[in-house]
Design a protein with these regions (language model features):
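Alpha/beta-hydrolase active-site loop
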Residues: 96-115
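Hydrolase active-site cap/lid region
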Residues: 138-194
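Short beta-strand/loop motif that positions the catalytic acidic residue
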Residues: 212, 219-221
C-alpha cells in the first residue's frame, strides 16, 4: 500500500512539473497593425516589443503577387525567439502595376528603419515575397536598407518563371506562375517591344547585382520546387561575379515550396541560425 501511495505521489509530482513547464513556455505575442502608406494594403503587423536587444525582421508573404497569404503563425514563432517581426503587406497586381510592389517594400523598410532608430532590418521573403526580398537586397545599394535577406523559393527571375511555365509538360503550378509573372510585368515577352523587355529585365534580381553594395543572401529551394533552384543559382552567380562573397544557396530534399520549406529537416534551424548570425 505504501509503495502504491509513493508511486501515486511521484506521478502527481511529475504531472505538476510538466504543467509548470507548459505554463512557463513563452506566449506568442499578439500583433499591432500600423500603416506605412495611404493604400489599404500598405500596412505592417508588428509582433514582439521593440528593443535594442531584439533584431528587426521584415517578413514578405508570397501569393504570386496577386493574393495575400497568412504568415502570422511564423511571425509569432520568430517573435517568440527574440525578433521584433514586421509582417508586411504590399499592393498586389490587381491594385497597381510594377514597380509598385517593390516601391511598397522599399517604403516599408524605410518605415521599419525609422521605427527601429536607424537600425537596418533583416528580411525574409517567400516565393513572390522572396522575389521582392531579393529585389530589396539588390536594387540600388541593397545593403544600405536590408541587413541580410533570406528568400524561400524566390522567383528571382520572373522571365525564367514565364519560360518554364510555357515549356511542354509544365506543371499546373508553373503554368499558373507564368500567367502571374506576365500580369506582374504587364506585357508578354512574345509581343512586347523594348519597353516591355526593359520591364522584364528590371524584374530580374540578377540585373541589379552589384556585389558588396548588396545584402548578404541565403537562398533556399527544394529539389522538386516548382520555382526551380536555378532561379537562385543564377542570382548567386551574378552576385559572386560582382563581388558579393556572403551568398549561400541551399537545396533540400522533397518538393516543399515557400514557407513549408521551414518544416523540412534542418531548414528551420539553419534559417534561424543564419538570421541570428547576421543580426
Amino acid at each position: 500500500m505504501r509503495r502504491t501511495l509513493l508511486s501515486l505521489a511521484l506521478c502527481g509530482a511529475l504531472m505538476s512539473s510538466s504543467a509548470a513547464t507548459v505554463e512557463a513556455a513563452p506566449r506568442p505575442p499578439d500583433g499591432q497593425v500600423f500603416s506605412y502608406g495611404a493604400h489599404a494594403r500598405q500596412n505592417i503587423t508588428v509582433y514582439g516589443p521593440r528593443s535594442a536587444h531584439r533584431p528587426a525582421l521584415v517578413i514578405l508573404h508570397g501569393g504570386s503577387w496577386a493574393r495575400d497569404t497568412d504568415w502570422s503563425g511564423r511571425a509569432r514563432w520568430f517573435a517568440a525567439r527574440g525578433f521584433t517581426v514586421y509582417d508586411t503587406d504590399y499592393r498586389l497586381t490587381s491594385d497597381a502595376a510594377w514597380p509598385a510592389q517593390r516601391d511598397d517594400v522599399l517604403a516599408a523598410l524605410r518605415w521599419v528603419r525609422h521605427r527601429e532608430g536607424g537600425e537596418r532590418p533583416l528580411v525574409l521573403g517567400s516565393s513572390a515575397g522572396g522575389h521582392l526580398a531579393v529585389q530589396a537586397g539588390t536594387y540600388g545599394a541593397g545593403r544600405s536598407r536590408a541587413r541580410a535577406v533570406v528568400a524561400l523559393s524566390p522567383v528571382a527571375s520572373p522571365y525564367r518563371a514565364w519560360a518554364d511555365g510555357g515549356a511542354p509538360g509544365a506543371s499546373t503550378e508553373r503554368r499558373s506562375l507564368r500567367g502571374a509573372a506576365e500580369r506582374l510585368a504587364g506585357c508578354s515577352p512574345d509581343l512586347g517591344g523594348l519597353r516591355c523587355w526593359a520591364r522584364w529585365d528590371d524584374l530580374a534580381a540578377a540585373s541589379h547585382a552589384s556585389g558588396a553594395k548588396d545584402s548578404p543572401l541565403l537562398l533556399i529551394h527544394s529539389v522538386g520546387d516548382f520555382v526551380a533552384p536555378a532561379h537562385s543559382a543564377e542570382l548567386a552567380s551574378a552576385q559572386r561575379r560582382a563581388g558579393l562573397t556572403d551568398v549561400s544557396t541551399r537545396t533540400v530534399r522533397g518538393a516543399a515550396h515557400g514557407g513549408p520549406l521551414l518544416n523540412t529537416p534542418n531548414t528551420e534551424r539553419t534559417t534561424l541560425a543564419w538570421l541570428r548570425a547576421h543580426s
